Regions:
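Elongated, mostly alpha-helical coiled-coil "stalk/stator" tethers of large membrane protein machines
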Residues: 1-115
Length: 115
């Protein structure tokens, strides 16, 4: 299946869920940091594609990349668990970018979050 289609489906579903929970701003910050981690550490993507790592190990890696030592938000952790259980971790960077784009369009904010 096309990377863009899959990524946008997950991003749209996440955006709807985030709005229903009132967590879109928190998720935006977490995804900005995750995007920054993907750009700063290209090996992060390779690690997530490693079949030897368990879902739990990958989830820990993703959460650390997104929030550091702080605990990840409930919505973020639930979404990442879904992505990992569905074996879509190879799409994660694209899902991340799609979500950030949807958020900015929804909030009419075109400036980038720079943590």
């Amino acid at each position: 299946m096309d990377i863009g289609i899959v990524s946008m489906r997950y991003a749209k579903a996440l955006m709807e869920y985030a709005k229903s929970m009132g967590a879109e701003d928190t998720l935006y910050k977490e995804f900005c940091m995750l995007d920054r981690s993907f750009r700063k550490h290209p090996d992060l993507r390779m690690a997530l594609e490693n079949p030897i790592l368990t879902i739990r190990e990958k989830l820990t890696l993703i959460c650390t990349a997104a929030v550091g030592d702080a605990p990840a938000g409930r919505e973020f952790a639930r979404f990442m668990t879904l992505v990992l259980k569905n074996r879509r971790e190879n799409f994660l960077q694209y899902i991340c970018l799609s979500f950030l784009d949807l958020y900015r369009k929804d909030k009419h904010s075109f400036r980038k979050y720079n943590p």
